[in-house]
Amino acid sequence: MVVDDEPDVEALFRQQFRRDLRAGRFLMEFASSAPLALQRAAEIGDATLILILSDINMPGMSGLEMLPIVRSARPDVPVIMITAYGDAETKRKALEKGAADLLTKPIDFAALRQEIDARLEQAA
């Protein structure tokens, strides 16, 4: 699941992973806010939610505020935070709150694909 309030993010992810999505290798859910992501994480079956990618800076509830809640509800699902601010303090806060990793924008989609592949292998 990708959590980001920017509408262009969904189009970008769908474009970057179009072959995988067309081939049915995995499904990609999108949530435009942290509260929607928490709701979807509670609804999605255990085996089908393998990774959450969340922007940090969102209106209302931030990704960092959502992080401990989603980790408590779904400890089986790693959360990777995405930010335009890759400073050491932001990374420390994200990891402290339970993030598996922190990616900085622009996103390295090749590295992200490797992470998704690893999660798919673990889920199989």
PLM segments and residue spans:
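Alpha4 helix (beta4-alpha4-beta5 surface) of REC/receiver domains from two-component response regulators
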Residues: 65, 72, 86-101, 114
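Conserved acidic segment of CheY-like receiver
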Residues: 1-18, 28-30, 34, 52
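Active-site beta3 strand of CheY-like receiver
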Residues: 46-53
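Receiver (REC) domain switch/output surface
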Residues: 112-124
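Receiver (REC) domain active-site loop signature in two-component systems and cognate sites
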Residues: 58
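A Lys-centered signature of the CheY-like receiver
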Residues: 105
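Acidic catalytic/metal-coordinating carboxylates
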Residues: 33-36, 62-65
